[in-house]
């Protein structure tokens, strides 16, 4: 079984979670999210993530039930479950969004996972990329070897499937993210469409693909930000950038596997560019999907949105029912024993 911190152990029973959710409402981290620390052989360090289990998960009546999983990315593992991540949230988290949708019947029970893909300080992003020059930040806690793609695919996803009652199949697994988290969710789904059936992004900080996806736009303030030096190298290893950029992966990947993923890419409006919206970057990626005759399955622009956590949570309120619809058939088939579980093969990959 996974090793929880003390406060998570206290909340092991779902009913107890609800009581604590009221009693500890003043704490910044949503107490319904459990922090788990695992020893990563890939990163060579201990790495944390949060998980939110559905109501009734611990009850005897549901002991044989398995659940679909949605991974939510930003950078630090706490961001999606931090009530005060910015002032726009007004004390709520994405778990409140999920619970409201569940009560309304717009989604079914699912497991939410919040991976940590940055340094402990959140100053160095990991981007779900295997770092080109990890030695540049050797002393930054939380990075280790910097092999974040391998950590997620080879360790974290199998860990979740082996320690929780998931439906360990791509048809019951999705990803979503905000800002750099949107880069990560679309990147990992385009790179590994065999693992995910649904991928969303709100205001993703995407890079620009050139030359039919073989190159990247070099004059880009995002690409040239020094915080990406360990990830992409200095000077930039443009081949490494292209191999890990969502836009390039969509432009050059196999059409059939990409078309088998539900894409849910959204952004703020053009009027909020350049500092409060990534409208142009999102439109670039959506356009590349369209060039492959692959549909973006959601309204692409939130007309009044800006780049903050209130709108990130609103994005999940829009996309979570669509993620659920993509996974619902797999949930039914798992209940009847039709779907084949694949976690063992993933864990040994």
Model-derived features: positions:
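Non-catalytic cap/lid and distal C-terminal segments of serine-dependent acyl enzymes
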Residues: 2-349
């Amino acid at each position: 079984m996974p090793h929880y911190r003390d406060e998570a152990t206290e909340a092991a029973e779902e009913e107890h979670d609800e009581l604590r959710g009221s009693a500890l409402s003043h704490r910044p981290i949503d107490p319904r999210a459990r922090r788990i620390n695992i020893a990563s052989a890939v990163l060579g360090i201990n790495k944390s993530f949060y998980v939110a289990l559905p109501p009734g998960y611990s009850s005897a009546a549901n002991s044989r039930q398995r659940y679909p999983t949605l991974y939510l990315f930003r950078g630090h593992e706490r961001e999606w479950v931090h009530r005060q991540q910015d002032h726009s949230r007004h004390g709520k988290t994405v778990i409140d969004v999920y619970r409201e949708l569940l009560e309304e019947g717009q989604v079914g029970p699912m497991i939410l996972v919040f991976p940590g893909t940055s340094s402990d300080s959140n100053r160095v992003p990991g981007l779900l990329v295997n770092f080109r020059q990890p030695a540049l930040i050797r002393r930054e806690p939380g990075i280790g070897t910097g092999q974040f793609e391998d950590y997620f695919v080879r360790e974290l996803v199998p860990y979740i499937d082996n320690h929780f009652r998931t439906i360990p199949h791509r048809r019951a697994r999705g990803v979503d993210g905000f800002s750099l988290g949107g880069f990560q969710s679309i990147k990992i789904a385009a790179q590994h469409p065999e693992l995910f059936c649904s991928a969303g992004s709100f205001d993703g900080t995407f890079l620009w693909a050139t030359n039919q996806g073989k190159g990247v736009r070099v004059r880009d303030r995002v690409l040239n930000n020094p915080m990406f030096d360990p990830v992409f190298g200095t000077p930039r290893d443009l081949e490494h950038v292209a191999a890990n950029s969502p836009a390039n992966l969509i432009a050059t990947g196999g059409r059939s596997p990409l078309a088998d993923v539900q894409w849910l890419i959204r952004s703020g409006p053009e009027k909020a560019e350049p500092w409060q919206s990534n409208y142009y970057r999102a439109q670039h990626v959506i356009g590349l999907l369209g060039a492959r005759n692959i549909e973006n399955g959601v309204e692409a622009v939130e007309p009044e949105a800006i780049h903050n956590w209130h709108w990130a949570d609103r994005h999940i309120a829009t996309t979570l029912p669509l993620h659920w619809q993509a996974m619902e058939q797999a949930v039914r088939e798992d209940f009847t024993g039709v779907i084949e579980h694949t976690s063992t093969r993933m864990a040994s990959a």
